Amino acid sequence: MEWEPVIGLEVHVQLRTQSKIFSGAATAYGAEPNTQACAIDLGLPGVLPVLNKEAVKLAVCFGLSVNASIPPYSIFARKNYFYPDLPKGYQISQYNFPIVQNGHLDIENEDGTTKRIGITRAHLEEDAGKSFHEGMQGYSGIDFNRAGTPLLEIVSEPDIRSAQEAVAYLKALHSLVRYIGVSDANMQEGAFRCDVNISLRPKGEEKFGTRAEIKNVNSFRFVERAILFEINRQKEILENGGTIVQETRLYDAVQDETRSMRTKEEAHDYRYFPDPDLLPVEIGPEFIEAVKNQLPELPWEKRKRFAASYQLSNYDVKLLTTQIEIANYFETVLKIDKTIPPKLAANWINGDLAAALNKNNLSITQSPINAEQLAGLLHRIADNTLSGSMGKQVFETMWGGEGDADTIIERHGLKQITDTEALEKIIDEVIENNPTQVEQYRSGKDKLIAFFVGQVMKATKGKANPQQVNELFKKKL
């Protein structure tokens, strides 16, 4: 029997606010444990939560970017459960009346086709604290710094049918929330976490199978590996006549497997009820319009503009717009020097710069070569001061911190030889010293032109303009 995976994702996105969702405590990452938790975060008697307006604005911003509806009001509810890092004994979340409803996000599959993934809802909630078990003898520690940090939980429809589609959706969502400034979405810091709901059903059937939920997967690769393992696990059980247990599972990256944590809770297990300390949130059309007017250019809008304005290939556009920081870097280079061909800038950013960043595990915001320095280098390539190979040499020197392109060119004597008279003298010598190859070229072996150009490049220590040399040889031969 052929089985079809049915996958839905719940993504927890930490909102980019200076303070927490219901208190004035800071949300900065990396502070000493329990130094950013106030009485409200700890749920001490007599305190009352006050909603952070910026969190509401960011949630609405996300909703508009995925073509969702923003209801006129939403309600906060208490989600009741016990866990040591949940100080109040309940989490303030949203249940029946979320702030964002019925949106969608289009993804591009590996074969180039587009698929629309529905977004059921996105709701605001507070994060819990964090438990620590390692390095503690006989006890666990709790850091409440994260408690009360604003989260937007984004729940997809069960429209995903493979691990590849799940990763494509996550990457598109990750890119979007960074583009619109909703979140830094730093996965290493837990600002973008994913729960995977997965079930199998016979291909062609409409009825859903029993699902398992894999909690808190924090990398694209781990999501893919967890889904592939879970599909095989459930398939093996079903084909051997067993039944799938509805449960919560954990992905173990070391063993590359999912393990059972507990049976899966239903909504009634959490005893949701409206939080009496918080009024319903009214969201008027004026507020929505104000947020809409502040929406930045969305990723798919930027891709369309790049292709039209800069005449770039889909491949180049896709690489340049993967991250907003890369797109901004590219456009900054072109704004600094309008004589630089966009294709030249795209080639260097997607090629040499990307390779150097990956090799050193750096983001483009950490690049030792800023946009102004790269623009200086590309200007010298565009005006034929440097050949492509010489440009690479300058790039490597610049990466090492030796200054801008002009300084390096002057210091190392790297200026390209473009003087026609000087080049013709060298070309004449090459022709005189290689009569056999000249005869072969004239009898039809056109590929020998590369040999002649190579001889000139060798004689000039790579400083000749290879295109110019090529043209001069063809004239003389």
Curated annotation (Swiss-Prot):
Q: Which reaction does it catalyse?
A: L-glutamyl-tRNA(Gln) + L-glutamine + ATP + H2O = L-glutaminyl-tRNA(Gln) + L-glutamate + ADP + phosphate + H(+); L-aspartyl-tRNA(Asn) + L-glutamine + ATP + H2O = L-asparaginyl-tRNA(Asn) + L-glutamate + ADP + phosphate + 2 H(+)
Which keywords accompany this UniProt record? Answer: ATP-binding, Ligase, Nucleotide-binding, Protein biosynthesis
Q: Which InterPro entries match?
A: Asn/Gln-tRNA_amidoTrfase_suB/E, Asn/Gln-tRNA_Trfase_suB/E_cat, Asn/Gln_amidotransferase, Asn/Gln_tRNA_amidoTrase-B-like, GatB, GatB_C_1, GatB_Yqey_C_2, Gln-tRNA_amidoTrfase_suB_CS
Q: Name one GO molecular function term.
A: glutaminyl-tRNA synthase (glutamine-hydrolyzing) activity
Identify the gene encoding this protein. gatB
Fetch the Pfam families from UniProt. GatB_N, GatB_Yqey
Q: One biological process GO term for this chain?
A: glutaminyl-tRNAGln biosynthesis via transamidation
Organism, scientific name: Coxiella burnetii (strain Dugway 5J108-111)
Instruction: Tell me its EC number(s), please.
Output: 6.3.5.-
| Subunit and interaction comment | Heterotrimer of A, B and C subunits.
> What broad class of enzyme is this?
ligase
Q: Which family does it belong to?
A: Belongs to the GatB/GatE family. GatB subfamily.
Name of the protein this chain belongs to: Aspartyl/glutamyl-tRNA(Asn/Gln) amidotransferase subunit B
The taxonomy runs: Bacteria, Pseudomonadati, Pseudomonadota, Gammaproteobacteria, Legionellales
Q: Which SUPFAM superfamilies match?
A: GatB/YqeY motif, Glutamine synthetase/guanido kinase
Q: Cross-referenced HAMAP family, in alphabetical order?
A: GatB
